[in-house]
C-alpha cells in the first residue's frame, strides 16, 4: 500500500509542486508508521483493486471522527488511488461504487471528499458521478497551503 500510495501521489501531483514539498508530504503521510495508524483506526476502511496478482488501486473511506473534517451522517472518500497504467479502465468508478454501497448500507446522508483545485481530471470525474462543490478548505502540502474543493453527493 505504501508503494502504490507514493507512486500515484507523485504521478498526480509532482508536476504542480516542488520536490521538497512532495518529499515532506510523502514522508509525513505515507510512512509505514502513518499507514499502520490509519489501518488500525476502526472508523477507516481500505479496499483494494487488483489486476491478476498486482494491486493497481485502492479506496480509503472514513466515518465519524476519522474524517479529515467531521461531518455527521456522512462518509468521507479520502483516497481513490489508481496506478496511471490502469486509469481509464473503470477501476476508480468501481472503487467509488464500493464507497457508495458502504454509505447506503450505513444509511448515511451523503458522501463527501476534498479535491485539489488544480486537479481538473479528478474534479471532472467526481462531477460526472454527481458530486457538487459545497465549500473549500486548506490543504498543506509540505510548506505550501493549497485549496481543496469540497464536494458532496447526497444519498
Q: What residues fall within each predicted segment?
A:
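Acetyl-CoA-dependent GNAT
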Residues: 2-15, 20-85, 96-98, 102, ...
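Short acidic-aromatic loop segments in the C-terminal HATPase_c
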Residues: 81, 131-132
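Active-site acidic-Proline motif in GNAT/NAT acetyltransferases
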Residues: 83-85, 89, 117-118
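C-terminal "cap" of GNAT-fold acetyltransferases
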Residues: 71-75, 109-123, 127-129, 135-155
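Short glycine-rich hinge loops at helix-strand junctions in the catalytic core
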Residues: 90, 107, 130
Amino acid at each position: 500500500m505504501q508503494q502504490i500510495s507514493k507512486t500515484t501521489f507523485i504521478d498526480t501531483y509532482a508536476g504542480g509542486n516542488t520536490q521538497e514539498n512532495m518529499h515532506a508530504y510523502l514522508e509525513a503521510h505515507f510512512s509505514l508508521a502513518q499507514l499502520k495508524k490509519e489501518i488500525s483506526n476502526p472508523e477507516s476502511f481500505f479496499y483494494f483493486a487488483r489486476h491478476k496478482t498486482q494491486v493497481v488501486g485502492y479506496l480509503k473511506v472514513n466515518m465519524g471522527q476519522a474524517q479529515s473534517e467531521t461531518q455527521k451522517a456522512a462518509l468521507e472518500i479520502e483516497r481513490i488511488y489508481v496506478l496511471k497504467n490502469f486509469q481509464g479502465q473503470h477501476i476508480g468508478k468501481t472503487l467509488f461504487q464500493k464507497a457508495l454501497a458502504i454509505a447506503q448500507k450505513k444509511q448515511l446522508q451523503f458522501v463527501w471528499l476534498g479535491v485539489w483545485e488544480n486537479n481538473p481530471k479528478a474534479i471532472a470525474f467526481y462531477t460526472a458521478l454527481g458530486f457538487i462543490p459545497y465549500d473549500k478548505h486548506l490543504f498543506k502540502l509540505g510548506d505550501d497551503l493549497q485549496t481543496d474543493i469540497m464536494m458532496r453527493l447526497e444519498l
